[in-house]
């Protein structure tokens, strides 16, 4: 297939080859990224990309859907087996659209929702004023404690009692600690609210039984299918059976047309991988690597938000190094370490500058990195940030990155 692309469109082929080279040669620490299997990529690049399939298995608006029906049913059944969900919709094109569908199912414009502050670890779709969620609905924010940088559940309860939200959103995009979903449901029940959990970042850890499962506690659970779940880029919704018809209607015809059946096939393959015994080993290694990396960074004198991690994610506060998150992201990329600048709790800098850097261990763990490599990465990050204006030091860091990545070849058949 790549040979056809190379012959037909040299420019696109060259860009893809360059990206493959980047992924092979750099240390990927963006917490929301991962490396899918060749099987997942083959499914996504299959002839299913040709098929329109508006509707759901057995109830399509197009003919010729008998085979894509099988694929979608496989995907849904596997998710139910993994997470114990009563109903699953695997059609959302993204996590944002999954969240939108839940909002459209139970909220009216202007309804009050309680969600996590973006700079404290939340997500754009949890009420940011620049996102549809913050425009359409009246979001009230909760956050983390100023000292511990952990969610203060008493504060969440107090705000829930004060504002009487119709929906409470739990889950985060930059929160390195375990979230108490049972406590969130108790709070929701106390004020008569629905509970939605966005488990996008931790879905793979939940699938492996290494993080509390929100499904028994939440009315709705949304997630992406990539990140720690190691599938293609996409979303899905898990919910109680009582909301099944409403959720499905919110996705189609509510906010989407035809589903991307080639992506759903890739999702099904990834879900099958998540059911294998070695996936639990993989997820445990993600956590082990994150803990080791956090310890190494702290030994190097770096400050971590909340003092460490319980999952795959680490948030570094770079202010004591007298640099910004923007500078840190740039200089690390210069030596071959890919991260993203990120706001930290009680942020004072612009979101385009930030005081933090977010990193994660899902992708490097997929590549085969272990504890020794985490020690080297911690050393590399600290060395690079402390010497960010020293070109000789940066050149040394580049060589160390190259030495590390060369030991772990990836996608050798591509």
Curated annotation (Swiss-Prot):
> What Enzyme Commission number does this protein have?
2.1.2.1
Q: Any coiled-coil ranges, and where?
A: none
UniProt-listed Pfam families: SHMT
Annotated metabolic or biological route of this protein: One-carbon metabolism; tetrahydrofolate interconversion; Amino-acid biosynthesis; glycine biosynthesis; glycine from L-serine: step 1/1
Residue list for modification N6-(pyridoxal phosphate)lysine: 227
In the record, what terms sit under GO molecular function?
glycine hydroxymethyltransferase activity; pyridoxal phosphate binding
Q: Which superkingdom does the taxonomy of this entry point to?
A: Bacteria
Question: Where does it sit, as one GO cellular component term?
Answer: cytosol
Q: Self-association or partners: how does it assemble?
A: Homodimer.
Task performed by this protein: Catalyzes the reversible interconversion of serine and glycine with tetrahydrofolate (THF) serving as the one-carbon carrier. This reaction serves as the major source of one-carbon groups required for the biosynthesis of purines, thymidylate, methionine, and other important biomolecules. Also exhibits THF-independent aldolase activity toward beta-hydroxyamino acids, producing glycine and aldehydes, via a retro-aldol mechanism.
What HAMAP family does the record tag this protein with?
SHMT
Q: Which family does it belong to?
A: Belongs to the SHMT family.
Protein name, entry field: Serine hydroxymethyltransferase
